[in-house]
């Protein structure tokens, strides 16, 4: 142990002077700073930092009695007795300002509240107003989160009135409102900021609802239009199908009626043929009896008219009514008429007019040629 102590003493003596180190030793902070400065300026060895080696005796209190046992002068124990560093290295004494710091660390105050508390402690409570002291108390006692400001109904009413007229406040007006409502300027400013954000959200929600309502109305109108178009198309299809059905039914009825009328008409014609030639023959005979000299003229006119009708190339000349007009002079009727108008006809009917057989032969020949020409066309 003496060897180690002598080595340490020799190391210390290698420094400029032991007295300078010992005189600067009693306060720990001063010894550390002065020795570090001196060693940094005067020492030339850079291998081992001398300040660390110099502070070893002061940091180890067990070495001080050993220094006394060695018979060396002991100014360091007196310095160690006067300074609280040996106990403070591990457990420093608690001063009031240290207690405040520990309390601040335990409660984890926000920096704004800590600064306000420090300012309150420095300047005193007389410099702060009642409202600010309440805010500081709320912030310091409430933990990490600041409590919300409780506004009264009158304050809210006045703030809402002011916001209705002015969304943004100038500083003089803000100070005036804060003084009237017993609030701080910061509280008024924050309230107006929050109210502007609320107003913005409300307007955006209204715009979104209006746009959604417009979109829904447009979609509903489009759906209604589509439904109306579908209805109109369906009605048109029904009307067209009904018209087609009516037309088909009408044509079917017409065809049925024509089919019914065709055989009935044919039967009527066939039944009336035996009678109609008689009536026509009787009429012809009467005409022949009363107007016998005009028969060649009538025949000539009939022949001319028929020739004109045959020579005409217009479609009206070939229509069905013209053929129906000549159906009266059919081959059967002509044959019947030729049979009736026989050489024995004057004797059977006892007519006083004498008609030659040549004239009747000419009449029958002309009628047959006319009918044959119509049949050919």
UniProtKB/Swiss-Prot annotation:
Q: Fetch the Pfam families from UniProt.
A: Homeodomain
Residues in the DNA-binding region annotation: 144-203
Under the cellular component aspect of Gene Ontology, which terms does the record hold? nucleoplasm
- Gene Ontology BP terms: anterior/posterior pattern specification; brain segmentation; cell fate determination; cellular response to retinoic acid; dorsal/ventral pattern formation; embryonic viscerocranium morphogenesis; middle ear morphogenesis; motor neuron axon guidance
Tell me the PROSITE patterns matching this sequence: ANTENNAPEDIA, HOMEOBOX_1, HOMEOBOX_2
Where is it localised? Nucleus
Quick one: where's region Disordered? 42-93, 199-229, 256-278
Coordinates of motif Antp-type hexapeptide in the sequence? Answer: 94-99
Molecular function, one GO term:
RNA polymerase II cis-regulatory region sequence-specific DNA binding
Which keywords has UniProt assigned to this entry? Developmental protein, DNA-binding, Homeobox, Nucleus, Transcription, Transcription regulation
Task: Kindly indicate whether the keyword Transcription regulation belongs to this entry.
Answer: yes
The record ties this protein, via InterPro entries, to: HD, HD_metazoa, Homeobox_Antennapedia_CS, Homeobox_CS, Homeodomain-like_sf
Q: Which family does it belong to?
A: Belongs to the Antp homeobox family. Proboscipedia subfamily.
Function, in words: Sequence-specific transcription factor which is part of a developmental regulatory system that provides cells with specific positional identities on the anterior-posterior axis.
Record's protein name = Homeobox protein Hox-A2
Which species?
Papio anubis (Olive baboon)
Originating gene:
HOXA2
